Amino acid sequence: PILRMGTKDFIKKCNDAEIDGVILPDLPLDESVEFCNNLKNKNISPILLVAPNTSEKRIKKISKLAGDLIYAVSILGITGNDLSSKNNLKNYLAKVKDNSETPFMVGFGISTNDDVNWFNSFSDGAVVGSAVIKKVLKDTKKGVVENFVKNLKK
């Protein structure tokens, strides 16, 4: 959609909507330099992704190109997956931290207070998406999502 719209129009629409960051999950790194720099010139942070199989060299490149944040994908797979092997992620998260000066948050499969606390101890924060969507779909009463998020922070 971004390329079809045109990068200049996309950046203008983001700027008009006062968007301050965009996640770019499928933009090839080697083709993204100009686009990411144009975003940053308009104070829009390009949020780039790293994964457990991302090399140290590539993490360094991503760190230099990213805006205010890197999104560290916790698993190879789709969002909402189980994190039963999360203890094996310590080396990966240390690799991201050691090879990037850019703050990073971890996402994919994070759904409990224990998950959030665990990932917060190895990163700059945790992203909870699918679990919030599931709460909204399960219960539309006012305050359900707010209470869920408050409990994640405890």
What does each of the following model-derived ranges do?
Residues 1-24, 147-150:
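Active-site beta->alpha loop and helix N-cap motifs at the rims of alpha/beta catalytic domains
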Residues 1-4, 28-29, 50-54, 105-113:
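Glycine-rich beta-to-alpha transition loops that act as phosphate-gripper elements at the mouths
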Residues 6-12, 84-92, 144-146:
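Charged helix-capping and loop-helix junction motifs
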Residues 10, 54-65, 106, 110-126:
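Catalytic cores of alpha/beta
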Residues 21-31, 72-81, 109, 122-141:
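Glycine-rich phosphate-binding active-site loops on the catalytic face of alpha/beta enzymes
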Residues 39-49, 97-107:
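Short beta-strand/loop segments at the ligand-binding rim of alpha/beta enzyme cores
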Residues 49, 59-98, 135-141:
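Glycine/Thr-rich beta-alpha phosphate-binding loop at enzyme active sites
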Residues 92-102, 111-154:
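Alpha/beta catalytic cores of nucleotide-metabolism and tRNA/nucleoside-modifying enzymes
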